[in-house]
């Protein structure tokens, strides 16, 4: 298996792919996926002809799988290959490639699992769900504007950054084992458990949260800000825990 360079030609084309109901997406390509949660399931590909022709989309049950025909595809030049996708529900997104995933609408689902193993980025708007899992193993970045859920799990194993700009949840678990940074603002979260075993930095901003357990075993630094009721810390690594901007409101 080897990749080939595909230079964009001048012929811009659109292709509609007929699909049934799906709620999971897997991409192993350089294509950018733009998702909208809607009433129907649809797929539309836009790009230069050579790129569109080389993209293969198959449906395995409730999973939509994006691959390339023949050898791998690496896009050369300024052109991008874009896939516009809509579905009534989305529960899983897996990216292993240089392509990006962007949710162009809010997401309302029972559970959402997102895993990024490539160099592409994942951008989410507001997510409303019971459980969410964001896992970053690659060099790309994961960013969520707002998450409202019962249980949130964040795991960073790669060199990319993971940021959640506003999290409302009952319980939140964050684990940083890579060299990237993990930033989150948490509002009204009753119980927070966070561990740092890597070289990246962990930055948590609390807004009227309950208890937080912080475990530092790596060389990265932990910065805690905002308001908590109780805080428990454990430090065995070479990094520092900065709580100078944290207030405990008992």
Kindly give the residue locations of the regions a language model identified.
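Intrinsically disordered, low-complexity proline-rich tandem-repeat tracts
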Residues: 95, 116, 136-137, 156, ...
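Glycine/small-residue-rich hydrophobic helix-like segments
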Residues: 176-177, 183-217
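Short active-site-adjacent structural elements
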Residues: 204, 223-224, 242-243
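Extracytoplasmic/luminal low-complexity segments enriched in Pro/Gly and acidic/polar residues
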Residues: 213, 217-225, 229-232, 239
């Amino acid at each position: 298996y080897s990749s080939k360079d595909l230079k964009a030609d001048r012929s811009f084309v659109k292709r509609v792919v007929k699909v049934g109901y799906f709620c999971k997406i897997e991409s192993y390509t350089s294509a950018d996926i733009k998702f909208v949660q809607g009433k129907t399931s649809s797929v539309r590909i836009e790009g230069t002809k050579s790129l569109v022709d080389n993209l293969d989309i198959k449906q395995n049950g409730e999973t939509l799988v994006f691959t390339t025909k023949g050898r791998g595809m690496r896009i050369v030049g300024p052109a991008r290959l874009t896939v516009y996708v809509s579905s009534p529900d989305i529960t899983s997104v897996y990216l292993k490639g240089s392509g990006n995933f962007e949710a162009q609408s809010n997401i309302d689902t029972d559970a959402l699992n997102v895993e990024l193993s490539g160099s592409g980025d994942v951008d989410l708007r507001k997510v409303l769900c019971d459980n969410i899992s964001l896992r970053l193993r690659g060099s790309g970045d994961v960013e969520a504007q707002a998450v409202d859920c019962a249980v949130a799990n964040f795991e960073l194993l790669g060199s990319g950054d993971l940021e959640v700009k506003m999290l409302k949840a009952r319980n939140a678990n964050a684990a940083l084992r890579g060299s990237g940074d993990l930033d989150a603002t948490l509002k009204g979260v009753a119980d927070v458990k966070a561990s740092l075993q890597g070289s990246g930095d962990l930055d948590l901003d609390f807004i009227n949260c309950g208890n937080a357990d912080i475990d530092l075993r790596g060389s990265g630094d932990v910065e805690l800000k905002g308001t908590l009721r109780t805080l428990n810390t454990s430090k065995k690594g070479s990094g520092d825990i900065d709580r100078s901007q944290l207030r405990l409101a008992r």
